């Protein structure tokens, strides 16, 4: 499709939506829009590697394509409607909160944006001046990223559960695996093996403690996104009565 569009002379801009994780970032970093040169062994999952591969292929093979690569960070919920448009990924935070333990530190940051902010940013990229052959993060950045401690406290407030930050424990994946048989008691009916696989996958990403720099996006006039903790209560309200196992099916069909 991209090859065909590169031959359309009237085409002014071609937006490819990838993922911020396609650069395979190192831990504890502020990640700027990097070169398209990551290697397969740097990627934990095929998804991010495939995104990185197509970005590089379009850039190298289609020089006439008016390409802009947009890299959203973690898209969770809607700033006004909560999880009504999509509950993707939100269940991960509920899972951690319910367990009271996970493989990340409470002070680790996570770069989350609402889906409406992501959509508005993509529309802005279609017409922004001076944006061509660029890689641009759509992300929370330094000012709007939040820590897991802040998320934990916001979930406690939104759910009305009496729990303290001190209740949380950082554990290893091995320790999570050892508690696999208790998952049904904690989460209700669920596929314990799928649940554990999800913990392994998202545990890796959550432990990276990375923030994706959004200076480029702000420079073309985008506003700062709402913090995840500012609309998290709406995500809780819109998923009330739905089990974590049911929410997982959005991402693990």
Which residues does each predicted region cover?
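Mid/C-terminal beta-alpha module of Rossmann-like enzyme folds, strongest
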Residues: 124-200, 219, 235, 242-252
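Active-site beta-alpha turn of Rossmann-fold NAD(P)-dependent dehydrogenases/reductases
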Residues: 15-18, 62, 71-73, 139
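Short-chain dehydrogenase/reductase
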Residues: 33, 40-52, 108-112, 145
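Conserved catalytic Lys-bearing alpha helix of Rossmann-like short-chain dehydrogenase/reductases
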Residues: 1, 50-58, 92
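Active-site loop of classical SDR/Rossmann-like NAD(P)-dependent oxidoreductases
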Residues: 201-215
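NAD(P)-dependent short-chain dehydrogenase/reductase
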Residues: 29-30, 59-111, 115-128, 154-158
């Amino acid at each position: 499709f991209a090859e065909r569009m590169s031959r359309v002379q009237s085409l002014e801009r071609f937006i490819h939506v990838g993922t911020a994780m396609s650069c395979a970032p190192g831990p504890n970093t502020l990640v700027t829009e990097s070169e398209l040169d990551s290697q397969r062994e740097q990627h934990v999952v095929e998804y991010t590697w495939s995104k990185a591969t197509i970005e590089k292929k379009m850039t190298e093979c289609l020089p006439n394509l008016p390409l802009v690569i947009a890299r959203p960070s973690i898209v969770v919920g809607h700033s006004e409607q909560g999880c009504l448009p999509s509950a993707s990924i939100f269940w991960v935070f509920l899972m951690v909160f319910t367990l009271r333990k996970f493989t990340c530190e409470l002070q680790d940051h996570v770069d989350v944006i609402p889906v409406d902010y992501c959509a508005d940013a993509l529309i802005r990229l279609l017409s922004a001046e001076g944006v061509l052959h660029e890689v641009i993060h759509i992300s929370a950045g330094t000012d709007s990223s939040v820590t897991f401690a802040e998320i934990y406290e916001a979930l406690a407030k939104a759910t009305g559960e009496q729990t303290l930050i001190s209740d949380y424990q950082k554990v290893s994946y091995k320790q999570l695996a050892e508690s696999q048989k208790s998952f049904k008691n904690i989460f209700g009916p669920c596929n314990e093996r799928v649940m554990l696989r999800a913990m392994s996958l998202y545990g890796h990403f959550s432990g990276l403690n990375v923030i994706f720099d959004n200076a480029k996006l702000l420079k073309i006039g985008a506003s700062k996104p709402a913090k995840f903790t500012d609309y998290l209560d709406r995500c809780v309200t819109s998923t009330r009565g739905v089990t974590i196992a049911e929410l997982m099916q959005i991402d693990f069909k």
